[in-house]
Amino acid sequence: MDYIARFGLEFNPFLKNSKDIIVEDDEFQEVRFRLNYLAQTKGFGLLTGSPGLGKTTALRTFAASLNPSKYKVIYNSLSTVTVMDFYRSMAEGFDEFPSHRKTDNFRIIQEAINRLSIEKRITPIIIIDEANHISNGILNDLKILFNFEMDSRDRAVIILAGQPQLNNILSLAVHEPLRQRIVMNYHMEGLTKESGRIYIEKKLKGAGCKQKVFEEPAIEAILNASNGTPRLINKYCNSCLLIGHNDGLVTIDANTAMQAINDNQLG
């Protein structure tokens, strides 16, 4: 018997590469509401939060929910690209052949936005993830890139998502003009204790589990150690299953949870 079968699971719901089980707690729903609002109003949006709170999951879920006949999503992660790669990737996102010159890519991107917005009535949704890595140069460029002076209406949605230090970057006086254009600003705090319990329960249920896996003291220990961070909850729960299987347990107790937490914190 493997550890998945031992705990009545069809698969391990706490692994990153397992089947997606989206748990929509109150904060997740609030983020979705605000992103949908931004999609209607257009302009700049800001989504921040500590690592592991589910920003990227929320963004991908939002993007997947959009009608492709009305919206075109271009996703970029600043953690893995250079400045030039960023603009080339954005041009390619609009199905355009990128240039080796930034000024040419500016023109290509602006013309693509105009074609989509004016001719096809399609709103571009540009998601810039890991934006806490953004340079002052790119921020200044964004202000110019999406400043269509022909009329006062925004023609695209630009979402900057990243860790809390992104707010510190944007608070610099040099970025005041860009900050004034932000129409949606939300900071994710993480799961409450109640939401954390529901999160674990729905993860297990989504994996076909019909039996009790975690004892209440174990859940309490996991939630206290994770501080409401879904990524850490997943990490601790996964370790609990492995340790529990190795020890021949039927349910995960507090001692097993503490061992899993300590192993991960030391590792």
Briefly describe each language-model feature range.
Residues D2-I4, R60, P177, E194-E201, ...:
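C-terminal alpha-helical "lid" subdomain
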Residues L9-F14, Y71-V73, V81-H100:
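Conserved NTP-binding/hydrolysis module of P-loop NTPases
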Residues R34-Y37, T103-E119:
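Conserved alpha-helical scaffold flanking the Walker A/P-loop in AAA+ ATPase domains
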Residues M1-K42, M258, N262, G267:
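A short, basic N-terminal segment
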Residues N76-S79, L170, V183-G196:
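Conserved AAA+ ATPase "SRH/arginine-finger" region at the nucleotide-binding site
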Residues F44, N114, K120-L160, A173:
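Conserved Walker B catalytic segment
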Residues Q40-T61:
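Walker A/P-loop nucleotide-binding motif
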Residues A63-L66, L166-R181:
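Short regulatory helix/loop adjacent to the ATP-binding pocket of P-loop NTPases
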